Amino acid sequence: MLNYEISGKGNENLVMLHGFMENLMIWEDLEARLSNDFTLIKIDLPGHGLSKMYAEIHSMELMAEEVKKVTDQLGLKNFHLLGHSMGGYVSLAFAELFSDDLKSLTLFFSTYFADDDEKKEQRQKSLRIIKEAFPTYVSAGIPNLFNPNEKDTLEGKMNFAKKIALSTKNEGVLAAVKGMIERT
């Protein structure tokens, strides 16, 4: 079973799926803003945070099926699903497989479009770099996720994101990249 945390006191349930090289801690800022209106279910995706590995390749569908096990265990129906980046890809797979469970679907910095050939090639290259120099991959890549005009004011958030990324299991990162390459 995937690791998850529940917080908030709202009448509606919001399941939150983090992005690549993140974990449920990434939602701290939003948690304070949403916890009066929603009961928040923050989930660590496979190979991230405290969740275990499930396969050599974590397809978006595999991850969605593991999320479904959590929502079933909690008896959730008619809930809101929020996905950030890769969590958005997982959310889309969840919506395809289990649409009857959802009240709404929200994507942050994600897309329903599959990767084009250029993006798939970038992901293939990243596999090698992750295997050979994961800390360098994190140090170089995380700042690119932030607005370049605000890097000075967002330095604390960038360092937080780097810390979370570096705590992610290397095998989990590789399995997620392979899953994103396969995404259609």
Could you tell me what each predicted segment is?
Residues 5-56, 60, 70:
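Conserved HGGG/HGGXW glycine-rich cap/lid loop of the alpha/beta-hydrolase fold
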Residues 33, 76-116:
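Conserved hydrolase catalytic core segment
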Residues 61-79:
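Conserved acidic catalytic loop of the alpha/beta-hydrolase fold
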Residues 36, 58, 74-77, 100, ...:
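Structured loop/turn residues at beta-strand edges in well-structured enzyme cores
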Residues 30, 59, 63-66, 137, ...:
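Hydrophobic alpha-helical packing elements
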Residues 114-121, 132-184:
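Conserved alpha/beta-hydrolase catalytic His-Asp/Glu region
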Residues 2, 38, 100-103:
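A structural micro-motif
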Residues 13, 23-26, 104, 164, ...:
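Residue-level recognition of specific faces of alpha-helices
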